[in-house]
Amino acid sequence: MTQELSVTRFDRRQFLALTGAALSVAPFHALASHVVGSEQRATDGYGPLQPVRDDTTGLLLLHLPAGFRYLSFGWTGDPLSDGSLTPGSHDGMAAFSTSGSRIRLVRNHELRRGTAFAARPMYDANGGGGTTTIEFDTVTGSVVDVWASLAGTAVNCAGGPTPWNSWLTCEETVAGPGGDNDYHHPHGYIFEVPVDGTASAKPIRSMGRFVHEAVAVDPATGIVYETEDQAASGFFRFLPDETSNLAAGGRLEMLALTDKPQADTRTGQTTNVWHPVGWVPIDDPDPDEIAADSLYSQGIEAGGATFARLEGAWYGDGRIYVVSTNGGEAQMGQVWEYDPTGERVRLIFESPGIDVLDMPDNICVSPRGGLLLCEDGQSNCFVRGLTVDGTIFPFVRNNIVLAGEKNGFEGDFRTREFAGATFSPDGRWLFLNAQSPGITFAVTGPWSDGPL
């Protein structure tokens, strides 16, 4: 594990500004006794939530604090700029600077088998997933352009932005040709989508074939941290041979707790306790014979640590934050903080029950240094804020009930997950997705009145 890397040092502030992450407020690692522990604290955040009408449709789709407004766009079935239709199952997403008042969003579509929704760029004609890219004007609050940027992939769940202005989209499956599948090619990879165009549609095999969820890139080193969404999962990192050129290859490793080899972190954990970590090699990141736990098993045999369903991941001010969707004694979720400089990890939050936090999934770091947690739980779904002083509060509530008013959708979608939370680089807009029926929202309001 001593192989040298060719590293380009990216400016941390440029990357934080690029993706709308925290710049001015003390991050979680500035906390000491204030980290949420046995006393789980909840506050009003921006105040009580109330139903708010969508600026686009006039429907009461979201509950928000007073003073906030939103608009919807990019519904499943809406036309793309070329006349084809927007695919569904909106999931992970990130916002990027372009020029002037315009930003671009790269958005995942977590679809499985089926005809690819675009002919180019396409990996597998029978892969239903991929990404679309949206150009949005932050002054006018309107969509300028939208196009398919990757097609023919499968189960594109989350991913993450890079400091070199691209989106890494992750396949949450290891399915391939044969059996019950009609895929032409193997799946379970990471693909790179440039913000200024379309993807090459070539998987980055050295980053591993497993049940991927999300990634977070450390701009100081170019190392890519990867989460795995399995009941027993590992936390991986990819050390590229050439920073910003991931396709050139690299090596994959899995986190281990050096004070407890083969540790199981799913339960029995204490908040605010640092654990020293090391990394064990994954010798075969793309095995010929694949099972969902093939790479995890390699890591465990070498002493790696087990987590419960690692999903969302995001970089913020020198730290990597990841969530375990059903970790903890209540199986309602954990939030972990990894310190790459100190090579240590700690639990900073564990949900005591469904009313506090119900199975977090996608996450992002807010402009003021907190975390936004998108729920994918068992009840009415929320987006919740977790602040730097260790408090949690509801910020968005799903109120989507439709009777055919838009694109023919009917049904009660209030228990369906939120995903893709990401702030505009100027911090004025929060973008997020309702996975079903497939809607993207842009939320704005008096951010300075509260902790996000």
Task: List PLM regions with ranges.
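Blade-level signature of beta-propeller repeat domains, shared across WD40, Kelch, NHL, RCC1
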Residues: 417, 422-452
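Beta-propeller domains
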Residues: 272-346
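C-terminal segment of N-terminal export signals and the immediately downstream linker at the start
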Residues: 9, 29-64
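N-terminal secretory signal peptides
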Residues: 1-10
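Conserved blade-ending motifs and adjacent loop-strand segments that build the rim/top face
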Residues: 349-361, 391-422
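Loop/turn-rich, solvent-exposed surfaces of beta-rich toroidal or solenoidal domains
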Residues: 324-325, 354-391
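Signature of short aromatic-glycine-proline-rich micro-motifs recurring in repeat-based ectodomains
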Residues: 85-94, 300-312, 359-362, 408-425
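N-terminal export leaders
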Residues: 10-28
